[in-house]
């Protein structure tokens, strides 16, 4: 069992920004630059359409920023891009430096727990997924991780951490 946890830890290697954010967020003096309150993703794939037009995705995101809630929708070539576009519509108005940040790598893996969770529903398509994302602002690169049973939730967690990492220490009320 300890070996399984150790293997999972090393699978998360490269996501140090998420781990550091977990520590920073526990501090009493840390002010989150934004909070994602809700995210809805509408993804449609039409296999009868030409390949370049098959996927139509729209994300609606509700974000709290500076004590105010903002709701916005955006489209993308898939759910990750649609969520990223929606978040940026709101956040770049307040934090223009986020326009420098780009998603460079995106990796999804199943986490196999070797019986830790314990039932067959947690295997295969029902398993936890680990999403690892690498971001860059042209100068620095940082990795984030999201782990959930829902691939979209894990992906959104990565995007949140990636954007928040760029803003850490810059947010003042």
Predicted region positions:
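Terminal or standalone catalytic/regulatory effector modules within metabolic enzymes
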Residues: 1-173
């Amino acid at each position: 069992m300890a070996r399984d946890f150790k293997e999972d830890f090393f699978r998360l290697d490269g996501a140090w920004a998420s781990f550091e954010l977990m520590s920073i967020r526990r501090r009493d003096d840390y002010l989150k630059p934004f909070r994602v309150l809700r995210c809805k993703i509408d993804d449609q794939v039409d296999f009868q359409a030409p390949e370049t037009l098959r996927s139509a995705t729209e994300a609606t995101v509700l974000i709290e920023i500076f004590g105010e809630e903002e709701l916005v929708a955006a489209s993308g070539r898939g759910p990750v891009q649609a969520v990223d576009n929606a978040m940026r519509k709101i956040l770049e108005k307040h934090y223009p430096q986020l326009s420098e940040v780009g998603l460079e790598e995106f990796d999804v893996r199943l986490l196999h727990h070797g019986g830790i969770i314990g039932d067959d529903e947690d295997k295969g398509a029902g398993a936890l997924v680990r999403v690892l994302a690498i971001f860059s602002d042209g100068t620095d690169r940082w990795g984030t991780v999201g782990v959930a049973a829902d691939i979209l939730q894990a992906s959104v967690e990565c995007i949140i951490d990636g954007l928040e990492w760029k803003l850490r220490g810059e947010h003042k009320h």
